[in-house]
Each structure stands twice: as structure tokens, then as C-alpha cells.
Regions:
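Structured alpha/beta or helical-core interaction and ligand-binding surfaces enriched in interleaved
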Residues: 1-91
Length: 91
């Protein structure tokens, strides 16, 4: 199962990885932590992840997200907020 808080993220995953297109995006029950899901075999998603890793070409993840026209600017703000929280843990 692949879960997301933002439906658009799963739509982009399906756009970029045709093997996921035959799997329907479903909305989970109210109150669940991740609202959106795709039920996909583990082996299929493992191939998707391997392709994603092989295709990494950016030097800065947050910067690449900020430059993407496909992502909501609020997502990039959330990435920076999470980064700031974890930065405080660094010693």
C-alpha cells in the first residue's frame, strides 16, 4: 500500500510510473492518518522506488520541489517546517 496526505502526489506517481496506473487511488475512511492510498503489490512498488532512486538528478530535494510546477507551494513550506524541526535534533 502506498499512502499519501495529498491526492496529487499519488496522481504524479501514477503519471510518472505507468505500472501504477491500473491501481485505483482510493480515499480512506474518515479520521485515518493518510487520506489517500493505492493498493499495489510490494514487488511492483519496489521497482517504482528503484526507478525513482536511479533517476535522482537533483542536489537539493527541497529546492527541486520548490522548482516543480506540479507541486503546491504549501508542500514546500511543509518540507521546510519539517526540516527545521529535525535540524534542532542535530548535535
Amino acid at each position: 500500500m502506498v499512502r499519501a496526505r495529498v491526492r496529487r502526489h499519488l496522481e504524479l506517481l501514477q503519471r510518472d510510473h505507468p505500472s501504477l496506473r491500473r491501481h485505483q487511488i482510493i480515499e480512506s475512511e474518515p479520521g485515518r492518518d493518510y487520506k489517500w492510498r493505492i493498493i499495489v503489490p510490494r514487488a511492483t512498488f519496489a521497482r517504482v522506488v528503484a526507478a525513482m532512486v536511479a533517476g535522482i538528478g537533483y542536489g537539493n530535494f527541497k529546492g527541486a520541489c520548490a522548482a516543480s510546477p506540479d507541486l503546491d507551494p504549501a508542500y514546500n513550506t511543509a518540507l521546510h517546517d519539517v526540516w527545521a524541526v529535525f535540524r534542532r535534533l542535530q548535535k
